[in-house]
């Protein structure tokens, strides 16, 4: 399963299927779901929504039927081999305004654990710009204003507003 912010999931499903197969798993199904983009709430707004949830229900029934019918093949998913290369790593960290109350919700919610629990303004290298800290801050004190991030937001808001639908893949279907 891949969750993405209404742009594209690139090779994520293929990479996941490959990793699981390398570990000896048969992967009968895969899906790419749309969620609100982490950098801007204007892209993928309100997703997943009721329409998505109906599609998820239908997909889960198809997967259950495939598994119960002793489906033993691995699903074919889109993607590229070799996988699309990663862009160069750029050390961009969120900033913290004076309105920070040191509640530490940002540190608690950071999946990379790069925000210090001693001082929310101290952020180690390793931020993936998921914006969990920005979204969890009750004071709006966490933010990104770096040119690189703002440029990406502008590109997303210009090119990725059209609704994309979840994509589902079931072996033998």
What do these predicted ranges mean?
Residues 22-39, 102-111, 115, 131:
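Amphipathic repeat-derived elements
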Residues 1-89, 145-153, 158-173:
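FMN-binding flavodoxin-like domain, especially the glycine-rich phosphate-binding loop
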Residues 96, 101, 105-122, 126, ...:
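Iron-sulfur cluster-binding cysteine motifs and their immediate structural context
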Residues 74-111:
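A mid-sequence, solvent-exposed acidic-amphipathic segment
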């Amino acid at each position: 399963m891949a969750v993405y912010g209404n742009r594209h999931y690139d090779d994520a499903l293929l990479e996941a299927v490959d990793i699981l197969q390398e570990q000896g798993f048969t992967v009968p199904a895969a899906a790419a779901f749309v969620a609100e983009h982490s950098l801007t709430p204007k892209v993928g707004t309100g997703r997943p929504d009721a329409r998505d949830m109906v599609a998820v229900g239908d997909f889960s029934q198809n997967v259950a039927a495939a598994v119960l019918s002793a489906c033993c093949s691995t699903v074919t998913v889109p993607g590229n081999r070799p996988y699309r290369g990663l862009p160069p790593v750029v050390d961009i960290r969120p900033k913290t305004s004076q309105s920070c109350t040191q509640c530490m919700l940002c540190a608690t919610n950071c999946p990379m654990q790069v925000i210090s629990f001693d001082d929310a303004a101290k952020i180690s290298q390793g931020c993936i710009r998921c914006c969990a800290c920005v979204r969890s801050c009750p004071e709006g004190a966490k933010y990104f204003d770096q040119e690189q991030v703002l440029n990406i937001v502008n590109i997303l808001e210009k090119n990725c507003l059209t609704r994309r639908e979840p994509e589902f893949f079931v072996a033998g279907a």
